[in-house]
Swiss-Prot record:
CDD domains: TtcA-like. The thiolation reaction likely consists of two steps: a first activation step by ATP to form an adenylated intermediate of the target base of tRNA, and a second nucleophilic substitution step of the sulfur (S) atom supplied by the hydrosulfide attached to the Fe-S cluster. [4Fe-4S] cluster binds at C140, C143, C231. Its main location: cytoplasm. It catalyses: cytidine(32) in tRNA + S-sulfanyl-L-cysteinyl-[cysteine desulfurase] + AH2 + ATP = 2-thiocytidine(32) in tRNA + L-cysteinyl-[cysteine desulfurase] + A + AMP + diphosphate + H(+). Its cofactor is Mg(2+); [4Fe-4S] cluster. GO terms for molecular function: 4 iron, 4 sulfur cluster binding; ATP binding; magnesium ion binding; sulfurtransferase activity; tRNA binding. It comes from Acidovorax sp. (strain JS42). The lineage of its organism: Bacteria, Pseudomonadati, Pseudomonadota, Betaproteobacteria, Burkholderiales. This is tRNA-cytidine(32) 2-sulfurtransferase. NCBIfam families: PRK10696.1.
Amino acid sequence: MNTANNTLPTAADWAGEDAAPDAADTRKIERESHKLEKRLCREVGRAITDFNMIEEGDKIMVCMSGGKDSYTLLDILRKLQKRAPVKFDIVAVNLDQKQPGFPEHVLPDYFKSIGVQYHIENQDTYSVVKRVVPEGKTTCSLCSRLRRAILYKVADDLGCTKLALGHHRDDIVATLMLNMFYGGRMKGMPPKLVSDDGKHVVIRPLCYVPEKDTARWAQYQQFPIIPCNLCGSQDGLQRVAVNEMLREWDKKFPGRIESMLRAMGHVVTTHLMDPHLHDFKNAKATGIADPNGDMAFDHEEFPVAPALPGLQVVQLG
């Protein structure tokens, strides 16, 4: 054992027979971490390719909140940057909205430690929101509008060509559900969009990544997470309910959320009810067979969902 100069024992000092279980656990964690890193890089790379998110010479502004998702986004983009087929720059940006208790040092310290270019924008939107929104009402909507306008201006000032947000697969599916349940429309979060002013391109490179993977990666990397409830306001009860529903679905029916995400990319407009997407009024029989047409009276066939591990289906009678 290394006890010179009264130093504490190192990991090597404990690498005897008694330490074997801990060493095995460490190797297992390292293997799982490596597999997760490869999966994250693969899924983010697939999203970038599928939707042409990043192009030669882009300057990507990664919007950092201090949560697990934005940390994961920044980390994976930096890993991909080293081996990407195109050259692009990254700048990490945090909007400090002057919420009471916000740890101002955490993000700058982290950015410096990893050597990434960064910018902290200080804007007291917290006071504005508290002054305008009545007590007891949710502040999220106004806060997000103010934040969006400020971030667009920062992107212009920094010469950024794209803004990258940390919304993941579960966020996208939850937004679709919220709009269907409470808004009466089929609308989610697009993986790539042009802002309403026509000047900015927003990308969501984590669109294929499940939340459980960003949570696990944040745990492995020990990111200095900043809590999201400093302002005292939370997402509405509707989003809370939908997120809980999706979590339960993921436990009981593995693959359902992934299937819903795939459905968002395979929309059959002729089989919905939006007259702006299909001319139902003028639909008439032509007498010409259409191999892709509808067999109106046929029963739709779906693949059998995989059974949960450890469960056996027993037929009675």
